[in-house]
Amino acid sequence: LLIPYPPLEEQKVSAHILSTLDEKFEVNNQINKVLENMAQAIFKQWFVDFEFPNEDGEPYKSSGGEMVESELGMIPKGWEVKGLDEIAEFLNGLAMQKYRPTENEKSYPVLKIKELRQGRTDENSDLCSSNIEKKYIVRDGDIIFSWSGSLLVDIWCGGKCGLNQHLFKVTSDKHDQWFVYQWNKYHLDRFVNIAKSKATTMGHIKRKDLSDSKVLIPSDELYLKAAQYQKYLFEKIMYSKIEIKRLEEIRDSLLPKLMSGEIRVPLNEEGDAS
């Protein structure tokens, strides 16, 4: 059986195109890690260590900033202590097997833990009816919290999909996404330990654990100053994730077409790509 192959030079050009795409989203992944680490470091400096710049540009706590007693210990004067569930809504997803699309009905891919981990849906993702309640539809930029099994908090940038059970969509009409996201990330290690302690069942957390997880609300003035940094970083991460998804889609679409010869790379007389 003879299998036709494109000319060697054409194969090399195709391989170069695909490897360039791979390199591009690997670079984006590395940039995202740096941005995430930067955002978390700034958040910890301001909201955990209380070393945000005072009026003179000096670290607040170590420069003698006024502190008051609270249930969390000493905190900056004027700050409030609240439960994690007081700053955001945690919407649990649906048992999507009950919402399968009917024949010829528009559908959405279902967001499960697998999809959250890989950052996108794929051809193996389950489908759900597009007629589910709007609040269960996930869009780019939504904060998703896997609270059972593999605990994970991430910014979803994999396109529109349906929210499956065991996942929270975390939203707030009181605070910016960066603020809600960073506090959820801050408490994630604690949630993982709580889940691990449930040895007889699949590890998970309860809503009471959200209430017991405390957050600090600064003054409006300081909140706005922090937002100048955090909002910018949050949006950079989100847009970079969206670009990674698009690059992966281009690669996955090109690969079988280049391999099959459906798409040919034009070469000039010297055998180079034209």
Locate the predicted segments by residue.
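Non-catalytic DNA-recognition/assembly elements of restriction-modification systems
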Residues: 2-42, 62-95, 220-266
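A short beta-sheet element
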Residues: 112-113, 131-189, 195-200, 206-210
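A short glycine-rich beta-alpha junction/loop motif
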Residues: 1-15, 161-168, 198-224
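Short coil/turn segments at secondary-structure boundaries
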Residues: 57, 62, 97-105, 194-197
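Extended non-membrane alpha-helical scaffolds
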Residues: 4, 29, 51, 80-83, ...
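C-terminal, helix-dominated tail/subdomain
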Residues: 265, 272-274
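Sequence-specific dsDNA recognition surfaces
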Residues: 66-69, 85-100, 107-140, 162-163
